[in-house]
Amino acid sequence: MKRVRCNKVRTVTEVKPNNAKIRKTYDLNEFDLKNLSSLESFENTKVKLALSKYMAMINTLEMTQPLLEVFRNRADTRQIVAVVQATMGFVHNRFNPLVTHFTNKMEFVTTETAETIIPGEPILFTENDGALLCAIDRPSIVKMLSREFDLSVAAEPQTSNREVLVAKTLVSNKRKRRSSNDEGYEFIKRPRTFSEYNQCMDALSDFNVTEIETTQYLLLLLIVEHAYLHYYIFKNYGALEYSKSLMDHSLFVNKLRSSTNAKMHNLLLSKFRFTVEESDKTSSGTTSKFTVYNFNK
């Protein structure tokens, strides 16, 4: 077959000025939706990343039971305290990113009776002979993690009675104390080197965690974040302001927002905002609101 040889062809594009314009119409709503979707996706990714880091940290404690079973076993105070203390340290690090260690001068006690608890506050702080005491309301945490409806708790709306309840509870929690430094009181072994930590992480790479288990970790993290913010008030403003914050969360929010608003963005509590409204049918169309305050404003 005979080949035909062609001469090389060179094309040239010339751009000439012209008054004609190419018009295209854009829908701004579409851009807004894409931007909102991107922001929501980014926030969801940050929430999932924070929760994944927390679950990986708890995995390094080498617990012998699942998270819910640990809190159901009232006799296993060692693991309960280890989980709460490790979670407090995790939240402390997210609240103060440049701080790597949490206080080791805290004593812990688990409470079981109604006289030593405050509804809605499963973790309380008080002072006992100059030492900081953390009281863990184990039954309430179990109900929250298992998502049970608590029909037996007595919530008193009157302010005067609530002040008495808070005072009695904080005093009752001082009667029993257990230190993390007591003789024979050993926390669960944690990794000390990168190789030990990597071994713990490798154990997470070949299985899936159910949504129910993940929700339990998320609930516990939110519980401890809420308690940590009260702890911040206790350490910086004293026991009196701390007790007031237990009764009135508007004071609780205002004190924190005044000086630590930037740090709140690292906590998962800053990702939620909603208001629960209840209509009062006895009065003429009035509505009482129970507001869950948001720090991300």
Curated annotation (Swiss-Prot):
Subunit-structure text: Interacts with host mus209/PCNA, cdc2 and cdk6.
GO biological process, one term: symbiont-mediated perturbation of host cell cycle progression
Similarity remark: Belongs to the baculoviridae E27 family.
Name of this chain's protein: Occlusion-derived virus envelope protein E27
Cell compartment(s), UniProt: Virion membrane
Function comment: Acts as a cyclin-like protein and plays a role in the modulation of host cell cycle. May promote G2/S arrest by interacting with host mus209/PCNA, cdc2 and cdk6. The cell cycle arrest is characterized by an intact nuclear envelope, concomitant with sustained activity of host cdc2. However, viral DNA replication still occurs in the arrested cells.
Cellular component annotations (GO), alphabetically ordered: membrane; viral envelope; virion membrane
Species of provenance: Orgyia pseudotsugata multicapsid polyhedrosis virus (OpMNPV)
Pfam families: Baculo_ODV-E27
Keywords on record: Host-virus interaction, Membrane, Modulation of host cell cycle by viral cyclin-like protein, Modulation of host cell cycle by virus, Viral envelope protein, Virion
Signal peptide positions on this chain: none
The keyword Membrane belongs to this UniProt entry's keyword annotation: yes
